[in-house]
Amino acid sequence: MMRTPIISLGQFKSAHEDLDKEIWRYHVSAAGKNKLPPEIMPKLLKQNAIDMFAMNPHTRIVFAAKADRDIQQRLTLGEVTDAFFVDIACKKHIRSISDIQNFDLEKIRKWMSARLKNMNFFGALDAAYYYDGTPLTDKKEPAVCWHGHFMVWDTTQKLLKKRQKKTNERFEAGWPGGKCFYFKNWTENIEGRAMYMMKAPQSEYSVALYKQHKETFDPETGEVEEIEIDKAKQYKRPLRPGSFKNIVDLYSRVEMRDILIAGGQGKSLLSDVINSAANQLAEDREAQRAARAEAIGLPWTPNPAPLAWHQIQKGPEQANKPAVLRTADDVVTNAISRLRNAPSSPLEKLRLGIKIES
């Protein structure tokens, strides 16, 4: 079964909520018992989304929502008119699953940025999981290919073609017939297409190798010769529960800031997304604590919301502290209302004794 591409915020939320359910369903099943690292599982909880762990579906949803909003704002203001979406995958970033600890994401980010040097771009690293790595690494065990998805704007197709040609001449994609640098112009639903960049791993892949016969003509001799060309076709299917352990291990120390990349005008977009997501996650965490205190009948004094606290730190001459605290109280109250209407995660339901729907 093919997974529907994520090209809207609504699809993004549904896909990551489903991923959250699948992970926890597997964790409490007989097949998944003791498979997922116990020290990693708390990082997947909604209450710990504030840690910005890249494999936490709730963290991803907040970051995607902020990216969607900030990109729409720039489209409305005319700062972004149309865009190109670029995919970059290189053989040097492919490893067997037993060798994944040797990945240096900082180096990969710098390498990806160099491919788009002097351009305005915003995007993220993603890990493609191959359940049979033989065609890529000559090893039967699963393999991982770190690659990048980027939105590039304020450039031309001609310039991107030059960059594409230069990159593809210097670097291999890692499978026969593959291209390291690929791009496509996108003029509609740009913010929706950007959601694909922000997703957590949703699928797993396989590669089938085959031979293609092609005739060549030698103009000097007039001879026609048939040659064989190595080719590869990739197949995709929804991520299987048995693959969760490898994916969770892969992302065990990865935060959102480790995989997001930007250059040129994209740096301000990245900054806006990270800051607004951090504030939203802090507000949500505060609301969760307030709701928990209210549920067990304990008194609750809200802490200042992140932006309000930042204002307080500027000094009394720049901020009216009582007013700021009232604002923080309002923020938490609003967040509590959102929280009450939001569905609980599977583990939170498990802790409360609520049956998880199958």
Model-derived features with residue positions:
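Right-hand nucleic-acid polymerase module
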Residues: 1-143, 154-358
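Conserved RNP beta-strands of RNA recognition motif
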Residues: 147-152
